[in-house]
Amino acid sequence: MPGVYLNEDDYNFDIALRRFKKQVEKAGILSEMKKRQHYEKPSVMRKKKKAAARKRLLKKIRKMNMA
């Protein structure tokens, strides 16, 4: 779990907030929260995963044809 600790001598809220946001983004908390916001049936998850794989494959094929 990301956390930022402040010293009493070096109290700069803006810098601490920036560091915290960076840690949260690096940990992937926001994307995980958006993904879990609504229940998704396993069949829907499989369909999305399969569609993403197909999209990656088509992109790879297009890239190979361009080169």
Curated annotation (Swiss-Prot):
GO terms for cellular component: ribonucleoprotein complex; ribosome. One of its GO terms (biological process) is translation. The keyword Metal-binding does not apply. It holds the Pfam family Ribosomal_S21. It comes from the Bacteria. GO terms for molecular function: structural constituent of ribosome. Keywords: Ribonucleoprotein, Ribosomal protein. Belongs to the bacterial ribosomal protein bS21 family. PANTHER family: MITOCHONDRIAL 28S RIBOSOMAL PROTEIN S21 (PTHR21109), SMALL RIBOSOMAL SUBUNIT PROTEIN BS21 (PTHR21109:SF22). This is Small ribosomal subunit protein bS21. It comes from Nitratidesulfovibrio vulgaris (strain DP4) (Desulfovibrio vulgaris).
